[in-house]
């Protein structure tokens, strides 16, 4: 049996200066949605991928929270030697996006090169009450546990 392995990276944790300017939503969604790279995509609590950046910005402005780190950018990557199918990665992206969808707007894009990976872009301002995603260790750990649970259903091992 071949074991597929996956890793999670919380981008703004390794690059704390990222995602603080007013063009963050548009820039990151444009990069991740590049048609030369993205093979699939989806949204939660957004009308469409086309309007996602403006909708996220509007939510932040509505609650006067258009400052500081604006996006939670999470990458879930899979090892190339045992590549999962695109439909499997789409189901995984959808299940992982639902973790945030009760309070936050989410867009995800799936890229296939150099390794299959999911870019999950979460607006850090809640559309429910305007509170910012706290991004504490416990929050990241809860998401990691959720992803581990989702992946285990596909026989994929999540590395720490």
Range-by-range predicted roles:
Residues 1-160:
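N-terminal nicking endonuclease/strand-transfer module with a His-rich metal-binding environment
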């Amino acid at each position: 049996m071949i074991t597929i392995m996956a890793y999670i990276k919380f981008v703004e944790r390794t690059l704390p200066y990222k995602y603080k300017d007013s063009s963050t939503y548009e820039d990151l969604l444009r990069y991740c949605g590049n048609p030369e790279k993205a093979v699939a995509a989806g949204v939660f609590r957004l009308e469409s991928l086309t309007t996602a950046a403006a909708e996220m910005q509007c939510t932040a402005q509505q609650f006067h929270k258009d400052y500081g780190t604006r996006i939670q950018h999470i990458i879930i990557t899979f090892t190339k030697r045992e590549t999962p199918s695109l439909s499997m990665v789409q189901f995984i992206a959808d299940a992982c996006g639902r973790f945030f969808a009760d309070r936050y707007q989410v867009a995800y894009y799936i890229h296939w090169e150099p390794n299959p990976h999911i870019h999950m872009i979460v607006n850090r301002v809640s559309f429910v009450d305007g509170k910012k995603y706290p991004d504490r260790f416990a929050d990241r750990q809860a998401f990691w546990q959720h992803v581990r649970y989702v992946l285990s259903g596909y026989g994929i091992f999540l590395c720490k």
